[in-house]
């Protein structure tokens, strides 16, 4: 009998964290790319039902605009990966995880981080899905 879920065969946790960050949400930027606060304007690879607001969770890539940060970064449209969310989600072992804030890391369209360090913890789901983010993270929860 085959294993359940696509993630089970790749060696990553096949958990799908709760999508708790809708379009329009403000996120704290947890790296040193120059942006401080971003606003979500779209979710990459989100296929929802009609007229439903797209939402994202830990490990998802979003399209966002920079609201606060260095003058050369402000008002730019960037891609980011969500590494923390306040809404709790359940892992397969029964543990429930939630963080103090909603945070993201600015990345290139290929998923390579634009900063060189990440402040604060990174969810394990995001670190396993985006290996380059996991390699520069100081704390993985």
Curated annotation (Swiss-Prot):
GO MF assignments: large ribosomal subunit rRNA binding; structural constituent of ribosome
InterPro entries registered for this protein in UniProt: Ribosomal_uL14, Ribosomal_uL14_arc, Ribosomal_uL14_CS, Ribosomal_uL14_sf
Keyword DNA-binding: no
A GO cellular component annotation in the UniProt record: cytosolic large ribosomal subunit
Keywords from the named record: Ribonucleoprotein, Ribosomal protein, RNA-binding, rRNA-binding
A Gene Ontology BP annotation from the UniProt entry: translation
SUPFAM superfamilies listed in its UniProt record: Ribosomal protein L14 (SSF50193)
Top-level taxon in the UniProt lineage: Archaea
Family: Belongs to the universal ribosomal protein uL14 family.
Function description: Binds to 23S rRNA. Forms part of two intersubunit bridges in the 70S ribosome.
Assembly and oligomerization: Part of the 50S ribosomal subunit. Forms a cluster with proteins L3 and L24e, part of which may contact the 16S rRNA in 2 intersubunit bridges.
Protein name: Large ribosomal subunit protein uL14
């Amino acid at each position: 009998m085959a294993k359940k879920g696509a993630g089970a065969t790749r060696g990553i946790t096949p958990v799908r964290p709760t999508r708790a960050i809708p379009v329009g949400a403000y996120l704290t930027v947890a790296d040193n790319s120059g942006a401080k606060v971003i606003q979500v304007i779209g979710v990459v690879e989100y296929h929802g039902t009609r007229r439903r607001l797209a939402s994202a969770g830990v490990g998802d890539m979003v399209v966002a605009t920079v609201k606060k940060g260095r003058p050369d970064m402000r008002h730019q449209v960037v891609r980011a990966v969500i590494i923390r969310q306040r809404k709790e989600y359940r892992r397969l072992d029964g543990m429930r995880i939630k963080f103090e804030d909603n945070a993201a890391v600015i990345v290139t369209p290929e998923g390579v981080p634009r900063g060189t360090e990440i402040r604060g913890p990174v969810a394990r789901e995001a670190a396993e899905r985006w290996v380059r983010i996991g390699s520069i993270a100081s704390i993985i929860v």
